[in-house]
């Protein structure tokens, strides 16, 4: 049965916290009986991730990638449904070079010359759905995937990320923000005191809500004027606000891309889902900062994301970096209890909990994920997890 693709429907994609006007194309295929196979083909042009608005079918400029002249793709070869055959094919100009690697599985691959161009083809057959396990790593770290990129080195991606935001003026100072920075760092004597107060202010005052800036959205950090006026943005805009604040305080700071939840391979494909900041300390080393995760957290970088790859967009260019390991003693939990067991076997007492780092953040989360009126119920639920007979006295 050949489906009439003219019957497809174009809908606004569901959105939560990020409102960039994404669309989704949906089509009804009808009832499927055992043994039926869906055979479909998707054609892509230009670059992997795009927020295309306006333009006509002949407007080729819409397909120019942000990193002009470069192509990358990240292709999951795992499936959620039994799949007879999956084919991925990319056609590039003869003069372009492409590096690729297939991870965590096998496929049939080839490169052929077709009509004066290079055609790379990757085929996998008889694919069964990947079985998930409790608390397993991300599927990108465990299941078959293809990574490819025409960009030679990570340094090239780093230089591009630096230039595209500097050229746009993402971190240009504005008087009203400079006044706030001067107010925040007044009386702060050390560089870490200044970095901490600026990071926490941005984290607590720029809420996570993404509004599209139009052209350039998705890879360009909103400028400080927009962020400080709207007091909202996604991770890149929150990081951009912090970078501008740090620069107004006299620091050297830049944006960085990272991948929360899975590793980034050596192939310089844009496998990132999060934006953070780096600040150069007096020692000359760069320190990562994550204002998106700092609210209700005593840390300046979430230690839940240790040994995580990130790429700073610095003027000298950077290779892929790795976030540092945080020692266990930075995340202690200490419970001091004073209890009394009576003759009837009832244990009564009080205890004090002190914590640091991510342990502190986890305890705070009991109180920060709900209303203040729910605090007592939240504490009672913690006690009931220990014993169904426990009661919160005060």
Q: For the regions a protein language model found, what residue spans apply to each?
A:
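Lumenal/extracellular ectodomains and adaptor appendage modules
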Residues: 1-82, 121, 153, 327-394
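Short, solvent-exposed loop/turn segments at the edges of secondary structure
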Residues: 22, 33, 83, 115-117, ...
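Second-shell loop/turn segments in exported
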Residues: 23-28, 181-189, 224-232, 364-368
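Generic beta-strand/beta-sheet core signal
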Residues: 30, 125, 203, 238, ...
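Secretory-pathway-linked proteins and extracytosolic
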Residues: 41-57, 65-216, 343-367
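Short, conserved phosphate-binding/catalytic loop or strand-edge motifs used
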Residues: 178-179, 214-225, 259-261
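Active-site-proximal cofactor/substrate-binding loop regions of enzyme domains
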Residues: 196-197, 202-203, 222-232, 238-248
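Hydrophobic/aromatic-rich core segments of domains that either
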Residues: 236-326
């Amino acid at each position: 049965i050949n489906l009439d693709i003219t019957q497809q429907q174009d809908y606004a994609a569901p959105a939560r916290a990020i409102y960039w006007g994404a669309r989704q194309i949906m089509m009804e295929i009808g009832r499927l009986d055992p043994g039926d196979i869906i055979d479909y083909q998707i054609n892509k042009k230009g670059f992997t991730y795009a927020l295309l608005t306006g333009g006509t079918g002949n407007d080729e400029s819409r397909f120019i990638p942000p990193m002009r002249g470069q192509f990358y793709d990240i292709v999951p070869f795992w499936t959620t449904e039994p799949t007879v055959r999956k084919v991925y094919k990319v056609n590039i100009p003869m003069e372009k070079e492409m590096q690729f690697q297939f991870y965590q599985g096998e496929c049939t691959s080839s490169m052929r010359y077709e009509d004066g161009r290079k055609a790379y083809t990757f085929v996998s057959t008889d694919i069964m759905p990947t079985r998930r396990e409790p608390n397993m790593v991300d599927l990108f770290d465990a299941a078959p995937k293809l990574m490819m990129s025409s960009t030679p080195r990570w340094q090239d991606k780093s230089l591009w990320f630096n230039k595209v935001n500097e050229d746009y003026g993402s971190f240009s100072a504005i008087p009203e923000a400079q006044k706030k920075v001067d107010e925040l760092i007044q009386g702060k004597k050390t560089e870490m005191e200044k970095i901490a107060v600026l990071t926490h202010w941005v984290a607590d005052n720029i809420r996570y809500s993404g509004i599209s800036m139009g052209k350039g959205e998705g890879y360009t950090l909103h400028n400080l004027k927009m962020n400080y006026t709207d007091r909202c943005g996604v991770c890149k805009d929150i990081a951009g606000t912090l970078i501008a604040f740090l620069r107004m305080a006299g620091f050297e700071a830049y944006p960085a891309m990272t991948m929360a939840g899975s590793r980034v391979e050596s192939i310089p494909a844009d496998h990132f889902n999060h934006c953070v900041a780096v600040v150069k300390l007096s020692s000359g080393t760069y320190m990562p900062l994550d204002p998106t995760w700092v609210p209700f957290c005593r840390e300046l970088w979430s230690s839940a994301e240790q040994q995580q790859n990130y790429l700073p967009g610095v003027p000298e260019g950077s290779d892929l970096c790795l976030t540092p390991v945080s020692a266990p003693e930075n995340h202690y939990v200490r419970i001091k209890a004073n209890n009394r067991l009576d003759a009837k076997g009832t244990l009564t007492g009080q205890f004090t909990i002190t914590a640091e780092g991510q342990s502190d953040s986890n305890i705070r989360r009991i109180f920060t994920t709900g209303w203040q009126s729910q605090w007592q119920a939240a504490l009672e639920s913690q006690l009931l997890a220990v014993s169904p007979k426990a009661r919160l006295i005060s």
